[in-house]
Amino acid sequence: MSERKLFTSESVSEGHPDKIADQISDAILDAILAKDPEAHVAAETAVYTGSVHVFGEISTNAYVDINRVVRDTIAEIGYTNTEYGFSAETVGVHPSLVEQSPDIAQGVNEALEVRGNADQDPLDLIGAGDQGLMFGFAVDETEELMPLPIALSHKLVRRLAELRKSGEISYLRPDAKSQVTVEYDENDRPVRVDTVVISTQHDPEATNEQIHQDVIDKVIKEVIPSSYLDDKTKFFINPTGRFVIGGPQGDSGLTGRKIIVDTYGGYSRHGGGAFSGKDATKVDRSASYAARYIAKNIVAADLAKKAEVQLAYAIGVAQPVSVRIDTFGTGTVAESQLEKAARQIFDLRPAGIIQMLDLKRPIYRQTSAYGHMGRTDIDLPWERLDKVDALKEAVK
């Protein structure tokens, strides 16, 4: 009998407390970058019943109305009703932002490679904002080259948000979570969806029967291809039986607590650094995007069915201390060739990544819910496949 395996990933909606915090942090980042592309930003947010705290370090000459940005973001998510215990117009906003540490700024503004060397490449000027390791991943399971469990999980909660915002399901509230378990065959290919879990916040008058039927008919069957569903697929819809109290009234939220949702759903390794609220000099964010860019182009070039890229940096140093590529036995060329090609084709210094992916723009708010990777609804530079030919040529 052939061996089959299960793998599970989850996602959360834009109304989840941690995702509210991520979106506020990235909305603040975008508002600052729109006025000052050279700004250094590390904005953290905490949300709970009736209150938002914004704190962190910012170096900029621009003025941004933090209070207004916070309220507008909360309203866009859908928290406009005081019955939810968290509303855009009544929430208390408490900003506490200070200037970036001069000790950190010293290494970021002038990398180790250029100190005392006036003739150095200008892209060596910016040092990494911190030490750390970052991963990027791609696999040929879906059109967007993402693992199927996280791809489906994102689509389910996005569909819930669409139905809520359009009014098609009028009783939905903003908070929601999804989880998808996929069965893989002996060749590690997805063959069916084993289990779907959806918990969605709702008005008190909505019945469990109504929610169950609507979610199956208008969400699950609209999102998951019928070829993956069978009579053994299990559905758990609001399994606690009631989800009226949600959002920050039900749980506090904090920036950076959904890093697996933001990336590959646990299918690939993660370096531990969060993305939201950080400008691109923070390699936690920019190098993770660069690693995804490399991995996706490798898979799209048919050089591997699956690719994971690790980058690592030292604070204040421009060049990465290591580049590692793992194709899990699916590569058509040696991994050492891919690593050499990646270093040749992709500029992996922080300033090089910023230039390559044009990361000084206010593009981050749109990434802060429903995943930073594999997005097909928005144009993200690290999702482009413009290095395929160069990679093929480099490994000949």
UniProtKB/Swiss-Prot annotation:
Cofactor(s) demanded: Mg(2+); K(+)
Cofactor binding: number and manner: Binds 2 divalent ions per subunit. Binds 1 potassium ion per subunit.
Residues that, per the record, bind Mg(2+): 18
Chain sites annotated for binding L-methionine: 57, 100, 251, 282
GO cellular component: cytoplasm
Protein origin, superkingdom: Bacteria
Transferase is among the record's keywords: yes
Catalyzed reactions per annotation: L-methionine + ATP + H2O = S-adenosyl-L-methionine + phosphate + diphosphate
Residues that bind K(+): 44
Broad class of where this protein is predominantly found: cytoplasm
Entry-linked Gene3D superfamilies: 3.30.300.10
Protein family membership: Belongs to the AdoMet synthase family.
Subunit: Homotetramer; dimer of dimers.
Family matches, as NCBIfam families: metK
Name of the molecule in the record: S-adenosylmethionine synthase
Source species of the chain: Streptococcus pneumoniae serotype 4 (strain ATCC BAA-334 / TIGR4)
